[in-house]
Amino acid sequence: MKKILVIDDHPAVMEGTKTILETDSNLSVDCLSPEPSEQFIKQHDFSSYDLILMDLNLGGEVNGMELSKQILQENPHCKIIVYTGYEVEDYFEEAIRAGLHGAISKTESKEKITQYIYHVLNGEILVDFAYFKQLMTQQKTKPAPSSQKEQDVLTPRECLILQEVEKGFTNQEIADALHLSKRSIEYSLTSIFNKLNVGSRTEAVLIAKSDGVL
């Protein structure tokens, strides 16, 4: 049984989504309305959920993208998908850069939403086609590997760490698996981010895949 959390400021939307998703007997869905409080993150155990569907426009002072970033700061292994009534393409790049696993429109069919969720649960990232084309275009304009600066090439250890990141493991879990300290993993991830010119684990995996590193 996979636990899903829907965060939205409209009770009808939350309950409707819960009803739709729970037609799948393998999904258990909870709903939560956000509060404009600094204690909101600490009051809830987001780590107990396998995936979070996050609305963007939560009303008042609460912004779904910022709330997602705060949750990921406290729970870096959380898998979050933007769940919005707006055009997905307008927010996809920001979501990926923030470390989220993609974006889904609320207007999608029940089957497609469920399919997207299972993709993410299986460790995959939902990549909008327009954004993927943009990524590939950027990669074509980069220097060939032979002309890259030596310090910009990922080390074998960094590649190994990135492979563990792709599997969805936390820094501590990666440290335990590789018999390294958590601090060492954090330093390595900072180096990876700088070399790939990215700001999140999700984006690092995407770029590494497009470069053939993973």
Curated annotation (Swiss-Prot):
Post-translational modification remark: Phosphorylated by ComP.
Keyword Cytoplasm: yes
Domain named HTH luxR-type: residues: 147-212
Modified residues (4-aspartylphosphate): 55
Residue span(s) of domain Response regulatory: 3-121
Molecular functions (GO terms): DNA binding
Source species, domain of life: Bacteria
Compartments where found: Cytoplasm
Membrane-crossing segments per the record: none
UniProt cross-references to InterPro entries, sorted A to Z: CheY-like_superfamily (IPR011006), Sig_transdc_resp-reg_C-effctor (IPR016032), Sig_transdc_resp-reg_receiver (IPR001789), Tscrpt_reg_LuxR_C (IPR000792), WalR-like (IPR039420), WH-like_DNA-bd_sf (IPR036388)
DNA-binding region per Swiss-Prot/TrEMBL record: 171-190
Presence of the UniProt keyword Transit peptide in the record: no
GO biological process: establishment of competence for transformation; phosphorelay signal transduction system; regulation of DNA-templated transcription
Signal peptide start-end: none
A single Gene Ontology CC term: cytoplasm
PANTHER family found in the cross-reference section: TRANSCRIPTIONAL REGULATORY PROTEIN COMA, TWO-COMPONENT RESPONSE REGULATOR
Function: Response regulator in the two-component regulatory system ComP/ComA involved in a major quorum response pathway that regulates the development of genetic competence. Regulates directly the expression of over 20 genes, including genes of the srfA operon, degQ, rapA, rapC, rapE, rapF, etc. Regulates indirectly, through the regulation of comK transcription, the expression of late competence genes.
Descriptive protein name: Transcriptional regulatory protein ComA
Organism name: Bacillus subtilis (strain 168)
Gene this chain is encoded by: comA
